[in-house]
């Protein structure tokens, strides 16, 4: 159970950072915020997401925080930590929301002052829209919360991350290594976004919206995308993503070959396999 006397700081009040701030405040924790945009900071203040916040001269907020949530892109988090990481006080445990861990966790842990611990985690939730104004619309309950400990993490920090996830409302919490996380995310998240984006880029017919049905809308929902964030995540995990794209391309080529050969049996076989795997997936979805 989380200690409600501890002070929380959210650095980066975007969609997920804003949601963390909102849920922690609703649960009775003291939450401060740091954000580059004055407008988004004011929104968080006016709507009660945070108790106080700053866009600059925020060293006092950093040094007084018991726990910090970084809602920053990986590159920005590393740059921020190089500048301000020395301000974190001993005993501070902090986490992130980044969708990629390789290249992030090791350098940040190496920069941690004595007694400070980076417990990396990934809330697999979001929306097509970004910014703190949409944070309240995010639903953590059906989403996965992935904790990625290393040998530098203590049992106390791992338990803190689990307790944090429960307070935030996640119903499914799991633990993976950094490498396992990035390989898995390359398939279940990044490949899906790559397919949706490619589908939208494959046809420039401006009249498509007049004829599409639910299948097209469902498949391309995530194609409305934060270009800067996803470009960074794709490039940071490019080896895993390229591997998954190659496997997907091989499966698509099998279907193409079946069409060229008028191979009805092969098509039906692929459809049955897809149906079976989707049914098994549905049974395992968190409620």
Located regions from the model:
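Interdomain hinge/lid region at the active-site interface
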Residues: 207-277
């Amino acid at each position: 159970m989380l200690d409600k006397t501890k002070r929380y700081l959210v650095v980066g009040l975007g969609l997920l950072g804003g949601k963390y701030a909102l849920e922690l405040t609703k649960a009775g924790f003291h939450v401060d915020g740091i954000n580059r945009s004055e407008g988004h900071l004011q929104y968080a203040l006016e709507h009660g997401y945070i108790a106080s916040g700053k866009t600059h001269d925020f060293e006092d907020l950093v040094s007084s925080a018991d726990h910090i949530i970084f809602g920053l892109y990986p590159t920005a988090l590393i740059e921020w930590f190089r500048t301000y990481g020395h301000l974190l006080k001993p005993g501070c445990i902090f986490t992130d929301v980044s969708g990629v861990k390789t290249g992030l966790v090791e350098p940040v842990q190496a920069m941690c002052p004595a007694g400070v611990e980076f417990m990396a985690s990934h809330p697999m939730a979001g929306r097509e829209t970004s910014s703190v104004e949409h944070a309240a619309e995010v639903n953590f309950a059906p989403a996965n919360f992935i904790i990625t400990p290393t040998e530098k993490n203590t049992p106390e920090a791992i338990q803190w991350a689990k307790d944090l996830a429960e307070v935030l409302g996640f119903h499914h919490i799991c633990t993976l290594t950094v490498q396992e996380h990035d390989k898995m995310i390359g398939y279940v998240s990044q490949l899906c976004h790559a397919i949706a984006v490619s589908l939208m880029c494959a046809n420039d017919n401006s009249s498509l919206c007049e004829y599409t049905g639910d299948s097209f809308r469902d498949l391309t929902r995530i194609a409305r995308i934060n270009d800067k964030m996803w470009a960074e995540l794709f490039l940071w995990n490019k080896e895993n993503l390229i591997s998954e794209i190659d496997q997907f391309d091989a499966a698509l080529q099998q279907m193409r070959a079946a069409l060229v050969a008028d191979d009805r049996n092969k098509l039906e076989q692929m459809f049955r396999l897809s149906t079976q795997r989707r049914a098994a997936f549905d049974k395992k979805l968190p409620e």
